[in-house]
């Protein structure tokens, strides 16, 4: 069930609507709020990521014209959960590895957004990996 949706887009911003059902206990209510906020966060992060994509036009890298292979789906890790978007992947005329301008321009680290990478680095510096997973799930509603 979708708890969050984009209800308006303009050139400079977008508006999100969130719906949360009342619950019988406050703890259940807070968990429902966290779920809705995380869903909205994934939706908004995906929208933010898309602003860093190209329009698919050819690009020049080192004097070589690279062309888009089209929109290809990828899932990114965010502080709120996973955000799946379609973005352009480019390839040189010689083939080989593809290049994603969105990932460079949005400063993606492997599949993590900058904020999520910062959160993970801070937690790993303090805890071991199993404790990081427990903390993310217990305190942020975020399974990794």
Language model features with spans:
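Short, conserved DNA-binding cores of transcription-related domains
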Residues: 1-93
């Amino acid at each position: 069930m979708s708890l969050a949706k984009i209800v308006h887009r303009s050139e400079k911003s977008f508006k999100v609507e969130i719906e949360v059902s009342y619950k019988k206990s406050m703890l259940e209510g807070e968990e429902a709020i966290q779920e809705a906020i995380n869903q909205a966060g994934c939706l908004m992060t995906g929208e933010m990521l898309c602003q860093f994509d190209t329009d698919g036009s050819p690009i020049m890298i080192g004097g070589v014209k690279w062309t888009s292979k089209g929109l290809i789906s990828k899932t990114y890790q965010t502080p709120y959960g996973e955000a799946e978007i379609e973005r352009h992947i480019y390839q040189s005329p010689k083939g080989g590895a593809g290049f994603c301008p969105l990932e460079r321009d949005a400063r993606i680290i492997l599949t993590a957004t900058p904020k999520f990478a910062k959160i993970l680095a801070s937690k790993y510096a303090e805890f071991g990996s199993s404790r990081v997973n427990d903390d993310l799930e217990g305190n942020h509603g975020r399974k990794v």
